[in-house]
Each structure stands twice: as structure tokens, then as C-alpha cells.
């Protein structure tokens, strides 16, 4: 335990919060190019084939990003917009791809929650 004099001289150090999306360099989104598009299986109680892409960002980092929604048109060399947000049952996937921007199409036939999947309003 420090003395009063030591606290006057140095003060207490604030514990720094670890950043959850370091590859975005403090920004809301970053553009990147897909280097690999693949499926991955989730952690223990769940079972599925989750769509994931390896993306090289403009910051120079390469990250794994989840492709949300049903069906996608992404291939190698597709240009995508990446936002933060992890996928709880996929270890190492801490980013999401934004649907409906750049080379990523929106989800077809989406009626509810359209803004999250880049779907246009149905006529």
C-alpha cells in the first residue's frame, strides 16, 4: 500500500480498457479485400456452417469477418466494408461484414430488420 507522499508524487494509474476491435484503428468501419471465403463450425453446444471471410484491411491487418444473413455473393478479391462486433460461438471472429455496401449484396427477400442486412424495401 502506497504512502500519502507516494500518491502525491505519482498518483493512481487508471486501468486501461482493452480494445475489442484493434484492427479498425479507432474508426467505425474499414474497407478491405477478401483473401479467402470459407465456412466454419461453431463452438460446443451449437452446430452449423457459419460463413466467414478472411479480409485484408486498408490498415494492413488481416482479420476474420462474419458474413451475416442467408446467402452471399462474396468471393476472393471482393471489396467489403468491415465493422466491429464479434460472433460469440466462433473463436477469433471479432468483426462483421456490412451487407449492401461495396461488392456485398443485401439479403434477398428480407422483410424485417432490413437495415441490418442492406435489403431494399419490398414493393
Curated annotation (Swiss-Prot):
User: Per the record, which residues fall in region Disordered?
Assistant: 1-47
- Molecular-function GO term, any one: tRNA binding
Keyword set, alphabetical order:
Methylation, Ribonucleoprotein, Ribosomal protein, RNA-binding, rRNA-binding, tRNA-binding
Which GO biological process entries does UniProt record here?
Answer: translation
Has keyword rRNA-binding?
yes
SUPFAM superfamilies from the entry? Nucleic acid-binding proteins
Q: Where are the transmembrane segments?
A: none
InterPro entries assigned to the protein according to its UniProt record, in alphabetical order? NA-bd_OB-fold, Ribosomal_uS12, Ribosomal_uS12_bac
Q: Which GO terms describe its cellular component?
A: small ribosomal subunit
Q: Which Gene3D superfamilies match?
A: Nucleic acid-binding proteins
Question: 3-methylthioaspartic acid modification sites?
Answer: 89
- One matching Pfam family is Ribosom_S12_S23
NCBIfam families listed in its UniProt record: rpsL_bact
Provide the family line: Belongs to the universal ribosomal protein uS12 family.
**Quaternary organization:** Part of the 30S ribosomal subunit. Contacts proteins S8 and S17. May interact with IF1 in the 30S initiation complex.
Known function? With S4 and S5 plays an important role in translational accuracy.
**What is this protein identified as?**
Small ribosomal subunit protein uS12
Source species of the chain: Desulforapulum autotrophicum (strain ATCC 43914 / DSM 3382 / VKM B-1955 / HRM2) (Desulfobacterium autotrophicum)
Lineage of origin:
Bacteria, Pseudomonadati, Thermodesulfobacteriota, Desulfobacteria, Desulfobacterales
Amino acid at each position: 500500500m502506497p504512502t500519502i507522499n507516494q500518491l502525491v508524487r505519482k498518483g493512481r494509474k487508471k486501468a486501461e480498457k482493452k480494445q475489442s476491435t484493434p484492427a479498425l484503428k479507432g474508426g467505425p468501419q474499414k474497407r478491405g479485400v477478401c483473401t479467402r471465403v470459407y465456412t466454419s463450425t461453431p463452438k460446443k453446444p451449437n452446430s452449423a456452417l457459419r460463413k466467414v471471410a478472411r479480409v485484408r484491411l486498408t490498415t494492413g491487418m488481416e482479420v476474420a469477418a462474419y458474413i451475416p444473413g442467408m446467402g452471399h455473393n462474396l468471393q476472393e478479391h471482393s471489396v467489403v466494408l468491415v465493422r466491429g462486433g464479434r460472433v460469440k460461438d466462433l473463436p477469433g471472429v471479432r468483426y462483421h461484414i456490412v451487407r449492401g455496401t461495396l461488392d456485398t449484396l443485401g439479403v434477398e427477400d428480407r422483410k424485417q430488420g432490413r437495415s441490418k442486412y442492406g435489403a431494399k424495401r419490398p414493393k
